[in-house]
């Protein structure tokens, strides 16, 4: 789950991470009072108007503007940004509509750095990544000047060691005593935030050093681990459904695990491991999966029908492969759901079904007697070849 920059900064502030003063705005009419308050509090006539979307690269896309002419200029900029379709490298060509703004005090920036924490699954550690090249696309930095990226890994038992923070400060050229002290405190606070809030990503680009030597998080990109949602009741209040995939939201509400992909073969599977294996075997035989969809071990007939509705919301889907291994899940329940969905939705794309396990014979009988054009598969490989052939004009690769 992602949150907006202003929400990330509110979270940072709770953990003692220094952030510039700022307030969110949802209408252009709210901007002038906010700008006036910031100018009065800081004595600085410069404020920054920032589009709030769940994507990076907002500045290059025209979503971040500096107002040096007080609240009137800030309001004029807000009117241009609010409602715009902001296109960045992370939104795709369709862009994302701007519905929220963050109005923030201007700072005297001397240096821009990059800082991030994320889960390194291979090492089973929290990885800290930093660079002297803040404000830039970190992927470009990694490609062109990898020597400017510094990494360290935090032992999950020992936690963040003080020497690691000092090593990072030295690598980033933060040698001034007070600046280094602030940086070490910031790193410790961010680590506390990352672990306590069950983050999967915490990124600040840029992390700035002001002319006075103070350190501030000028950006805040935060993602939470969805698996920890059960112990964070406050997450619901931070969720912005306008920024989320409506199909994935529908799946979540139905108790289904769904991720949209860019292929054209819909997949309906029970179990995450089997779902991934199904996608792999479709690719092996020359097809491209349109989604990851795990209906779980005890899905009802209604959930199976909802799963079909979700798959068919994508106009790219040219065929569907149902791959079920029934343990707790009963094959006859799946078959009944498949039949109900196909009839109700007027299914027009090829459908291949492979059933194994509990009540498999009853399930196959239901499919055979349904009167629908459903291809039965004897194995996962057989099913993958059949659906690829059906969507590729009768040919499947080996």
UniProtKB/Swiss-Prot annotation:
Residues 9-250 form the ATP-grasp domain. It is an enzyme of class 6 (ligase). This is Succinate--CoA ligase [ADP-forming] subunit beta. ATP binds at residues 50, 57-59, 104, 107, 112. Its cofactor is Mg(2+). It catalyses: succinate + ATP + CoA = succinyl-CoA + ADP + phosphate; GTP + succinate + CoA = succinyl-CoA + GDP + phosphate. GO terms for cellular component: cytosol; succinate-CoA ligase complex. One of its GO terms (molecular function) is magnesium ion binding. Keywords: ATP-binding, Ligase, Magnesium, Metal-binding, Nucleotide-binding, Tricarboxylic acid cycle. The keyword Translocase does not apply. Disulfide bonds: none annotated. Its EC number is 6.2.1.5. It comes from the Bacteria. Succinyl-CoA synthetase functions in the citric acid cycle (TCA), coupling the hydrolysis of succinyl-CoA to the synthesis of either ATP or GTP and thus represents the only step of substrate-level phosphorylation in the TCA. The beta subunit provides nucleotide specificity of the enzyme and binds the substrate succinate, while the binding sites for coenzyme A and phosphate are found in the alpha subunit. NCBIfam families: PRK00696.1, sucCoAbeta. Substrate binds at residues 270, 327-329. Mg(2+) binds at residues 205, 219. Pfam families: ATP-grasp_2, Ligase_CoA. InterPro entries: ATP-grasp, ATP-grasp_succ-CoA_synth-type, ATP_grasp_subdomain_1, Succ-CoA_synthase_bsu_CS, SUCC_ACL_C, Succ_CoA_ligase-like_bsu, Succinyl-CoA_synth-like. Heterotetramer of two alpha and two beta subunits. Transmembrane segments: none annotated.
């Amino acid at each position: 789950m992602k949150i907006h920059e202003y929400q990330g900064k509110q979270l940072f502030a709770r953990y003692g991470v220094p952030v510039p003063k700022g307030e969110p705005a949802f209408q252009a009419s709210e901007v002038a009072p906010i700008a006036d308050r910031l100018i009065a509090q800081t004595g600085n006539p410069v404020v920054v108007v920032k589009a709030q979307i769940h994507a990076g690269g907002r500045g290059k896309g025209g979503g971040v503007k500096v107002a040096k002419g007080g609240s009137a200029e800030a309001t004029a900029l807000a009117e241009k940004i609010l409602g715009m379709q902001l296109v960045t490298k992370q939104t795709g060509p369709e862009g994302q509509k701007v519905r929220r703004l963050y109005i923030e005090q201007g700072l005297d920036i001397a240096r821009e750095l990059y800082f991030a924490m994320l889960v390194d699954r291979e090492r089973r550690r929290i990885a800290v990544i930093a660079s002297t090249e803040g404000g830039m696309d970190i992927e470009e930095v990694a490609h062109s000047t990898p020597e400017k990226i510094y990494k360290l890994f935090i032992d999950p038992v020992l936690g963040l060691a003080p020497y690691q923070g000092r090593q990072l400060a030295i690598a980033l050229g933060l040698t001034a005593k007070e600046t280094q002290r602030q940086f070490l405190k910031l790193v410790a606070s961010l680590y506390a935030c990352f672990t306590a809030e069950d983050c999967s990503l915490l990124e600040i680009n840029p992390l700035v050093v002001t002319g006075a030597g103070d350190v501030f998080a000028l950006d805040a990109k935060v993602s939470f681990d969805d698996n920890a949602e059960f112990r964070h009741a406050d997450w619901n209040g931070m969720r912005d459904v306008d920024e989320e995939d409506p199909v994935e939201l529908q799946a979540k509400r139905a108790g289904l695990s769904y991720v949209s992909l860019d292929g054209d073969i819909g997949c309906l599977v029970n179990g995450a491991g089997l779902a991934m294996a199904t996608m792999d075997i479709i690719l092996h035989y020359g097809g491209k999966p349109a989604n990851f969809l795990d209906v779980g071990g005890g899905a009802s007939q209604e959930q199976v029908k909802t799963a079909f509705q979700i798959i068919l919301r994508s106009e790219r889907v040219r065929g569907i492969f149902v791959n079920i291994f029934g343990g707790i899940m009963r094959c006859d329940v799946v078959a009944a759901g498949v039949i109900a969905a196909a009839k109700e939705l007027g299914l027009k794309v090829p459908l291949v079904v492979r059933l194994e396990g509990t009540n498999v014979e009853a399930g196959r009988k239901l499919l055979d007697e349904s009167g629908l054009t459903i291809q039965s598969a004897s194995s996962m490989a057989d099913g993958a070849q059949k659906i690829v052939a059906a969507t590729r004009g009768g040919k499947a690769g080996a």
